Every structure is written in C-alpha cells, then in structure tokens.
Amino acid sequence: MKYSPSQTRSGCRLALVLLISALLVSAAPAAAQDARLEAARKEGKVVWYTSLALTSSEKVAKLFETAYPGVKVEVHRTGSQRILQRMMQELQANIKNVDVVHTSDAGHYVLLKEKQLLMRYTPAGVDRFAAGFKDRDGFHYGLRATVNVIAYNSQKITAAEAPRTWKDVLDPKWRGRLVTAHPGYSGVIATHVLALVHLHGWDYFKALAQNKPMLVQSAVDPGGIVASGERPVAVNGGDYTFYQLKKKGNPVEIVFPKEGVPLVVSPSAITSFAPHPNAARLFTDFIFSREIQQVLADTEGLYTGHPEVKYPADRPKLGDLKLLQVDPEELEKRNEEIKTRFVEFFGA
C-alpha cells in the first residue's frame, strides 16, 4: 500500500503527539515529587512523636535527612501513653507542634480520628499492605507490628522448667522472679493486657500480682532485666526486644505461648493541624517505603505490613503464629479501665 505525502505527515504528527504525551505523563509524578520536596524544604523540618525505640527512630531520621537534604527530622521518643498525653495537653494550651504521630496503641487513633485530629492521607504503596495494617477511612496505617511473648534467662532457668503458657507464670515458684511492663506507659502492654483479659479474665492479673513481679515501664524494658538475670522471667514484652538481645549473645530465650500471642499493630498518622504538612507527607511516604520497612525488620526485628519485606530464617512468620487480636475501638473504650485495674492489682 502506498501513502500520500499528506498521510505520511499526518502519521508523523500523530506519533509526535503520542510521544510528547507519554513524556508529559511520565514527567508529571516526578514534577509533583520535586514540588513537594521544594515545599518541604521551605518548611525546613518535620516533627515526629514516636514510640519506636530511640536508636531505630534516630536511624530512620538520619536516613530521611540523607535522602532529602534540607529537611530535618525532630524526633521526640517516649512511651505511647505519654505521647497521647503530651499531644492532648499541648492542644489544650493551643500548641500545635507535632506533624507525624506514631504510637503502639491502636485505640489512640480511634480517639484522634473521632476528634478530627488526623489528616486523611494515603502513603504511596500501602494499598498492598495487609488489611490489619490499614484504616478503612485512610487516616492511619500500621507502621510496624510486634507480638507479646514470655522470655527467660537461659543461664538461670533450663528449657525444661521455663514457663510455656501464660498461666504457667502464675505458679508460686516464680514469686519474686518475674518482670512486667506497664500499660499506663506502654501501648504494647495495654493491648497485651486486654488480650489476656479476653483469654483468662481479670483474675489472671490478680493472681499474677501475687507473684510480686518487678514493674517497669516500656515493653522494651523487660528484655534488659531478663538478660542481666535480675529477674529471670519476663511475663510480657515485645518479641523483637528479646530477639535483638539474643542475637547479640545474651542468654535470652523466647517462648510463644501455645494459647496464642497478642498482636500489636502500631499505627502512624499525620495530624490535621501539622505545622509542616508537606514535610509530613514526604516523611510518611518515606517511612512506609519498602526500604524503610525492611530497615525496621532488619534493625528492630519487627514485623511490617509490606508484602516485599524479608525476615530472618530464625524468625517465625506471623502466619505461623496463633494471634490474639484486639479491636482498636474496644481498646480505646477500655483504656482507663485497663490502667486502673492494673494499678489496683499491682499497686503502681
């Protein structure tokens, strides 16, 4: 078939239009990213309230600052309950300081969403995350997850005598030899307490108190107590802390009780009043990227919702564990009850 000169010119023009259109489409996301970065640089920083361990939160901050020069991360790390308390006290004083808030108490996000204190924002790629890591309304997403376990010092206790179930730690032989973290400080432990109340009732904690466990604050703290041998058995704590200690050569062994382990998904969200909203969006995209989700798995031993994250061979997969899950709305409604009853039984 022969083409006339006019047909040839028309075909060339069409090809050129399609090429230019394709280039414009591919350039649009890059241009938008450049515009966001420039806007974030004008803001200068992002303020992050987080319950993530300080070494890891500072590492994430440095990685972000390296990736995006000109935008600093101001890290404020403390326990989940303290974060919420500080945020609410600041708002009462009309102080709007925090951009991105991350705690280990999913119930906090029910409250914050009800009070319209969260910005609806969907980080890039989270559509692929597991359902349990996503708010159906798009206000918050699970940055990380852990499970609560029992752990013991293998130099003080043999594997044969170590507790294997949650009720095993109620045996009087463990009196004065246990350590527990506190739900008044830790969101991880608040979730743990409610999960075991569902499983065994408040009588479980009344009986546990009779064994006089040492009280510490964070879900991270029992690990050091067990590793030192000061108290040889932890009745709770994030599995990742014990895993880290064991990898460093400490005499720590982890027990995943057969009745199930409480799963704690720790959300992250941008506040609706964020003073640095562009930096907050940029930072949120960054922490939910595969690269940073992998950092959390590698450096902290944490679980994440990202489907491409790889885990060490010696870590059980979430799908292989019997998980005890708590409804965030119930956790929020019963938060004060959890803290009050715990103090009633343990005295502090």
Language model features: what each stretch is:
Residues 107-111, 232-251, 300-301:
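A ligand-binding cleft/hinge motif common to bilobed small-molecule-binding domains
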Residues 13-26:
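Bacterial N-terminal signal peptides
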Residues 49-61, 73-92, 96-230:
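Extracytoplasmic ligand-binding site segments that recognize negatively charged/polar headgroups
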Residues 31-47, 65-66, 171-176:
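Immediate post-signal peptide segment of exported/extracytoplasmic ligand-binding proteins
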Residues 149-156, 194, 264-276, 295-296:
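A bilobed periplasmic-binding-protein/Venus flytrap-type ligand-binding module shared by bacterial periplasmic
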Residues 118-125, 138-141, 167, 244-262, ...:
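Short beta-strand->loop
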Residues 131, 146, 174-184, 206-209, 215-216, 287-311, ...:
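Periplasmic-binding protein-like
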